Amino acid sequence: MCGIVGAVAERNITAILLEGLKRLEYRGYDSAGVAVFTNEGVLERRRRSGKVSELEQALAGEPLIGRLGIAHTRWATHGAPCERNAHPHFSADELAVVHNGIIENHEALREQLKSLGYVFVSDTDTEVIVHLLHHKLKDTPDLAVALKSAVKELHGAYGLAVINAAQPDRLLAARSGSPLVIGVGMGENFLASDQLALRQVTDRFMYLEEGDIAEIRRDSVQIWTVDGLPVVREVVQYHEGAEAADKGEYRHFMLKEIHEQPKVVQRTLEGRLGQHQVLVHAFGPQAAELFAKVRNVQIVACGTSYHAGMVARYWLEGLAGIPCQVEVASEFRYRKVVVQPDTLFVSISQSGETADTLAALRNAKELGFLASLAICNVGISSLVRESDLTLLTQAGPEIGVASTKAFTTQLVALLLLTLSLGQVKGSLEEGVEAQLVEELRRLPTRLGEALAMDGTIEKVAELFAEKHHTLFLGRGAQFPVAMEGALKLKEISYIHAEAYPAGELKHGPLALVDADMPVVTVAPNNELLEKLKSNLQEVRARGGELIVFADEQAGMKNGEGTHVIAMPHIIDALAPILYTIPLQLLSYYVAVLKGTDVDQPRNLAKSVTVE
């Protein structure tokens, strides 16, 4: 991890590589580097620990000018974040490699290569790859042949870009478990781990499939499958407004993306609602026939997407009467799973490249699930390509590492799934679907009303400026919302935060409550409100300070140690979507007060493409 850029052209490509790295900064990283085969016929590199801007300064002082090069932003997995461990890695000053992923057998390969005389200067698993490839080149002068041989010895995940001083007209790539995309130009071609890195030079992309190896030249691309057979991958044209990668009037991408939620929720609903019901064919032409067979749902996801799945469980069981299990992908893939008959496997991922979620999907195909369905924000991702059915969210590119608009659009998509399954199976109560469809049409307006509380929440954030711990509480479908609120706060403000069902207070968390631990609660006006109020009294009795986001009809008022922020009234089924907004804003303003890097919080990456 975390970002790869490569280029082969008739012009100097250093600026292209640098701009590509800047466009990948949102993914999170701790060091950066670039290697170029210069016009003087020498393979040279520049590396820096820290930001891409520091690498840019190094290149300003010692420029690299050439027509072939690779670049990388690293998120440390093996070896500390330092210049010595930064990519690209060299072998004999004639071969350079950048790598996303984890090589699981790197220790054994390292010892083997040491015995052959190779000297290691870093602590990374990547350096093993470049020396192994150099060793393979002793048997053949063809870099593509050597790469095909080398990857057979690698166990784990990798996305590789390779250049060789002896073959200065080509860029090699290999993909297994880590995404790579080729950017197709006119007399020049490019490579990246994310097409966003290349949008300044092309709008035409070719996505490598699992196991592919590619040889990229200025005027041609040749690809081989995992079996070594030549293959042609489709060229896809991508259109996205330039404003997606620009903060505009906002201080941070995260704040911009929070405020985009009414618009992207509207987009996610477009073309999917009839007059009184959800249009089932939005999931695909075979969806209705397949949904009629569904008796159970298994949801698998990671992080924020997992929280979306937890909310969906309340909807699927409470509205559609369909049993549902939700599991973290990294746990699901490593345990023995008992699959109930006619179970729909649902995976959720913003990027569609989350390593554990992809692995869980591939594992699910061997376990006898009825079919697979992806909820995803990227229509050309691996998750979408490998699933039977898909419902795309329409969040647009999400630059901030902490997910915001992707989460709310995932919730909308999952509610559409719930209503579609209930409609086909006839398990919804009479009038429920028509009511919810009408409320969904109003949802963007309700979200706008919540965003109008921005100034109020900014003032509430001041209560957290000197705090080190926070407790989030919710009941029912609001418990996963509380979990998401706690995750956002810890991600970007570095304040320790935990979430619990409010009914569990007396089973442990109450021991932590005092004047130094704020307690944040979401309180829609539903059948659990009175029980929640009792839980909050337990907090106040122990001196805890309450921040309550409560329905305007809930009858809750400010008092000593109690700060109530009135929320627009909304039907209970949609409350998890609405109540997410103030928790995102709260986390954002607390982080701003603490002076953290909101868009690129420490130690985190946007797209987790390794286990």
Swiss-Prot record:
User: Which parts of the sequence belong to the SIS domain?
Assistant: 287-427, 460-601
Q: By its UniProt entry, which NCBIfam families does this protein fall under?
A: glmS, PRK00331.1
Does the entry feature the keyword Nucleotide-binding, yes or no?
A: no
Q: What does this protein do?
A: Catalyzes the first step in hexosamine metabolism, converting fructose-6P into glucosamine-6P using glutamine as a nitrogen source.
What domain of life does the native source organism fall in? Bacteria
Q: A Gene Ontology CC term for this entry?
A: cytosol
UniProt-annotated location(s): Cytoplasm
Annotated signal sequence range = none
Q: Where does this chain mainly localize?
A: cytoplasm
How is the quaternary structure described?
Answer: Homodimer.
Name of the protein described by the UniProt record? Glutamine--fructose-6-phosphate aminotransferase [isomerizing]
Coiled coil ranges (UniProt) are: none
Q: Which GO terms describe its molecular function?
A: carbohydrate derivative binding; glutamine-fructose-6-phosphate transaminase (isomerizing) activity
Name any Gene Ontology BP term.
Answer: protein N-linked glycosylation
Residues of the Glutamine amidotransferase type-2 domain? 2-219
- Nuclease among keywords: no
Return the EC number: 2.6.1.16
Enumerate the SUPFAM superfamilies for this protein: N-terminal nucleophile aminohydrolases (Ntn hydrolases) (SSF56235), SIS domain (SSF53697)
**Pfam families noted in UniProt:** GATase_6, SIS
**PROSITE patterns xrefs:** GATASE_TYPE_2, SIS
Keywords, in A-Z order: Aminotransferase, Cytoplasm, Glutamine amidotransferase, Repeat, Transferase
So what does this thing catalyse? D-fructose 6-phosphate + L-glutamine = D-glucosamine 6-phosphate + L-glutamate
Catalytic residues in the record: C2, K606
